[in-house]
Structure formats: structure tokens, C-alpha cells
């Protein structure tokens, strides 16, 4: 409390033994202990009275409650799912299954639209671009029950 080490206390005890003598030293130590106890009790009583007057307990309780509330709010933010606006999904070309006979009939042009044969030149290499979807009536792919429902 006062920053007194054991060696300093031992030195004070030796001086007291030399000054008071062995007969009066136990009584003096008892009296000193009583005085120290009274000082501690009076100091604690004054401290409690001052704290009571300024409301330190109430302030401490409020600070503690505010700290707990802020921790609970942070926990709720972490545990609660975030409310984000769903981003629109770009439609993907729908896969279709053509009937075997309908595909050959639909793809074959009429005889009147058949172009004249071209000169023998090499055909250009096909590109990797996807072809446009065919707008022929066809049956749609069967719905997989594990996928979400399709939009109309």
C-alpha cells in the first residue's frame, strides 16, 4: 500500500525492539495494529459515503449495462442474416428437346428456297459463338425436382 518492502519493515521492527525493549514491544505492536485497523475502517467508511453521494455505483452499473447491451447488439448483427437486395439474374437460353422427326423437317428448307451451288471454295471455320435459339415449337426439357421452379 505504501511501497514498504520486507527489509524496511524488518529494520523498523529491530529499531522498535531496541527502543522499547522486549517487555513493552508486544503491547506497542498490538496498539499499532489497532490504530492501523481503525484508520482502514474510517478510510473505507469515508470512501463509501463519498461514492454513495456521487452515485458511483449507479454510474458503474449503467456503464456495465451499456457495455453488455452493445455486446448483445454486435452478437445479433453477426448472427442475424444480412438483408441484401437480391440481384436480378440474367435469363439463360432454355434448353429444349426436339422430337426426332420434327427436327429434320423443321431444319430442311423448302425446295424452292434451295440456293444454287457455290463455287468450290473452302468454307469458313465455324466460330465458337453460340447459335441463336430456334423458335420452333418443341417440347421443353423435363423439370428436375431438385431445381427451383422456373419463371413463366
Swiss-Prot record:
Asked if the keyword Kinase belongs to this entry, the reply reads: no
Q: What is this protein's gene name?
A: tatB
Tell me where it mainly resides.
membrane
Tagged with keyword Secreted: no
In which domain of life is the source organism classified? Bacteria
The entry lists its GO molecular-function terms as: protein transmembrane transporter activity
Q: What is the protein name given in its UniProt record?
A: Sec-independent protein translocase protein TatB
Membrane topology classification? Single-pass membrane protein
- Protein task: Part of the twin-arginine translocation (Tat) system that transports large folded proteins containing a characteristic twin-arginine motif in their signal peptide across membranes. Together with TatC, TatB is part of a receptor directly interacting with Tat signal peptides. TatB may form an oligomeric binding site that transiently accommodates folded Tat precursor proteins before their translocation.
This protein's UniProt keywords? Cell inner membrane, Cell membrane, Membrane, Protein transport, Translocation, Transmembrane, Transmembrane helix, Transport
Q: Which GO terms describe its cellular component?
A: TAT protein transport complex
Coiled-coil ranges from the UniProt annotation: none
> Low complexity: which segments have biased composition?
98-115, 128-142
Question: Which stretches are transmembrane?
Answer: 1-21
> Record's family?
Belongs to the TatB family.
Q: Which GO terms describe its biological process?
A: protein transport by the Tat complex
Describe its assembly.
The Tat system comprises two distinct complexes: a TatABC complex, containing multiple copies of TatA, TatB and TatC subunits, and a separate TatA complex, containing only TatA subunits. Substrates initially bind to the TatABC complex, which probably triggers association of the separate TatA complex to form the active translocon.
